[in-house]
From Swiss-Prot:
Protein name, UniProt field: Methionine--tRNA ligase
Sequence motif: 'HIGH' region, positions: 12-22
Gene Ontology biological process terms in this record: methionyl-tRNA aminoacylation
Organism of origin: Corynebacterium jeikeium (strain K411)
Name of the top EC class for this enzyme: ligase
Extent of motif 'KMSKS' region: 350-354
Gene Ontology cellular component annotations, sorted alphabetically: cytosol
Reaction catalysed by this enzyme: tRNA(Met) + L-methionine + ATP = L-methionyl-tRNA(Met) + AMP + diphosphate
Coiled coil: none
Binding site for ATP: S353
Self-association state and partner proteins as the record states: Monomer.
Entry binding sites for Zn(2+): C144, C147, C157, C160
Sample GO molecular function, one term: ATP binding
């Protein structure tokens, strides 16, 4: 029976081009998952966008002497182009600086406020002694008081994942000029997490199928739960929709309050962009719908605690009760699973644009194409542990696995069939060896599919490649090149090549979620016509919204910007064996995965940072 599956993908921050570490965490895994779900016959809604609020953009805009919106516009376009080039099949990839997003964020806040889960409290805020300027928490860095990491931020330590306040830091310093900040009293809106703790605990304890590291970390957060500030002393962000606050341009909603609402606002935007304004409700209000959230491990807190708390409070499901808001009919669905990846490093160091330790997605795509990067991430990415990227490992995997194992299987199988028959040959009687291979290949659909469904992407692609290896062993044992020299063995030649072609078709289907670009080429080589694996498109749209936000500093109405969308219903691929038909005309195969120069294993391309 068909299911509805919401695939919510972490929002990349619009302060620069994305590097391969970013897409290893949120991009490729989520796309493999979404493509598989569509192939399996499920209704998928995959949403995300660029995150364009918060301190880092302000700091960078000041350094570059430009406005924050101009900076966000620049990198929004670059990120959209790069992610579309990688084949990430979003139904909508939008941005947080839209009028629709502001309005939906304000609706969530208002519901929480009306239900008593958003309360004001005087807290300690930081200011610059030299300028008197307010320093939001992400302007401040220092030593984490919990794990001792030296570069913890004023809202969170990325090393241990714990939430912090700026005054918690040991030896705090300003990111702008390095000076020690002063702390003064300031009033903010707090999300009353203690009032939602019981509901959060009940929900989390039912998530027994989550990755153990994610569940354990999330449950540990509840041991010291306290109200969390959801506003900031900053002039860039969503206005606070409360009288006396909404026209104060010096206070805005916290970037992480609005960023997680983006999954909902993007779904709502997608619905009215396709002309069916209530379509989003099928994924958000139907209790049978499933929702999966993909991100790096540094964002677990916001997806397993803050976002569920916002949803519960908006629905009046905390200890204070309350009325469900207009978007909850009867409720907004909580995450089915939070799928967190670990970090991808480079030669043992964290990716860092400022330090030159970075490989940008667009540079990688120009040099090697999308499927090479997708393959490396799927087979060697940081699925459950931190993983190190080296050019040596990349070259080895592309040459020995993708080119030698899979590319060689396709090339020699189709080449022999094309040379000897020009079409898919009609087989004779199948031997035990033929039937065994075909049965093993057919069984792989369940194995690979189950693994992808459980977010075990490495295990899935490993099984698909194992079948490719078995087919290569079969061809080596059957020796069709010898059969081709004996006219009396022509029927047996046809049978062997038919069997091998069927397995090539099977493996191509199994690899389609992982390698959609080469899958389309192989489909055509095997005589297929039309769209096998649909790709996303970049579309220019106008910022307009059926909901009107309030306050000062709103996005300009009517401006245009790029989004990623796609019609994935037009593709032919399904998650099942496609029976090849004798007589189907074949095409002469072309090299799919050119072997990489072994010298690249030493230092990578000329544009790449030098490995140490």
């Amino acid at each position: 029976m068909s299911k509805r599956v919401l695939t919510s993908v972490a929002w990349p921050y619009a302060n620069g081009p994305r590097h391969i570490g970013h897409v290893a965490g949120f991009g490729v895994p989520s796309d493999v998952f979404a493509r598989y779900q569509r192939m399996a016959g499920n209704e998928v809604l995959m949403v995300s966008g660029t995150d364009e609020h918060g301190t880092p953009l302000l700091v960078q805009a000041e350094k570059e002497g430009t406005t924050v919106q101009e900076l966000a516009d620049r990198y929004n376009r670059i990120i959209v182009e790069d992610l579309a080039g990688l084949g990430l099949s979003y139904d909508l990839f939008t941005r947080t600086t839209t009028r629709n997003h502001y309005a939906v964020v304000q609706e969530l806040f208002t519901g929480l406020y009306n239900n008593g889960y958003m309360v004001t409290q005087t807290t300690r805020g930081a200011i610059s002694p030299s300028t008197g300027r307010t320093l939001p928490d992400r302007y401040i860095e220092g030593t984490c008081p919990i794990c001792g990491a030296k570069d913890a931020r004023g809202d969170q330590c990325d090393n241990c994942g714990n939430q912090l306040d700026p005054e918690d830091l040991i030896d705090p310093r300003s990111k702008i000029n390095g000076e020690t900040p002063e702390f003064i009293d300031t009033e903010h809106f707090m999300l009353d997490l203690p009032a939602l703790a019981e509901a959060l605990t009940t929900w989390l304890k039912g998530r027994t199928d989550w990755r153990p590291n994610v569940l354990k970390f999330s449950l540990n957060l509840l041991e010291d739960i306290r109200p969390r500030a959801m506003s900031r002393d900053i002039d860039w962000g969503v206005p606070i929709p409360v009288e006396g606050w909404q026209d104060n341009n010096a206070k805005k909603l916290y970037v992480w309050f609005d960023a997680v609402v983006g999954y909902l606002s993007a779904s709502i935007e997608w619905a009215w962009r396709i002309g069916d304004p209530d379509a989003w409700r099928k994924w958000w209000n139907d209790p049978e719908a499933l929702s999966y959230y993909f991100m790096g491990k540094d964002n677990i807190t916001f997806h397993s605690q803050i976002w569920p708390a916002e949803l519960l409070g908006y629905g009046g499901q905390g200890s204070k009760g309350g009325e469900a808001g207009d978007l909850a009919d009867p409720a907004l669905n909580l995450p089915t699973e939070v799928v967190s990846s670990e970090f991808l490093t480079m030669s043992g160091s964290k990716f860092s644009s400022s330090k030159g330790v970075v490989i940008y997605v667009r540079d990688f795509l120009k040099e090697f194409g999308p499927d090479a990067l997708r393959y490396f991430i799927a087979t060697a990415g940081p699925e459950t542990t931190d993983t190190d990227f080296t050019w040596d490992e990349f070259v080895r995997r592309i040459n020995s696995e993708l080119a030698n194992e899979w590319g060689n299987l396709v090339n020699r199988t189709v080449s022999m069939a094309y040379k000897n028959f020009g079409e898919v040959p009609t087989p004779g009687p199948l031997t035990a060896e033929d039937e065994a291979l075909l049965a093993e290949s057919a069984k792989a659909f369940d194995v690979v599919g189950d693994n992808i469904n459980l977010s075990r992407f490495k295990a899935g692609i490993t099984e698909a490649m194992r079948i490719a290896g078995r087919a290569n062993q079969y061809i080596a044992a059957m020796e069709p090149w010898k059969l081709a020299k004996d006219e009396n063995q022509r029927e047996r030649l046809a049978t062997v090549l038919y069997t091998a072609l069927q397995v090539v078709s099977d493996v191509n289907t199994l690899l389609t979620p992982y390698l959609p670009f080469s899958a389309q080429k192989i489909f055509e080589t095997l005589g297929g016509e039309g769209i096998w694996a649909a790709q996303p498109e970049v579309v220019e749209v106008t910022d307009e919204s059926p909901r009107e936000p309030v306050g000062v500093g709103l996005p300009e109405e009517g401006r245009t910007y790029p989004v990623i969308m796609g019609d994935y219903t037009k593709q032919k691929v399904t998650w099942a064996r496609q029976e090849i038909q004798p007589g189907t005309q074949l095409s002469k195969p072309k090299p799919l995965f050119p072997k990489l120069d072994p010298e690249l294993a030493e230092t990578g391309p000329e544009w790449a940072p030098v490995q140490k």
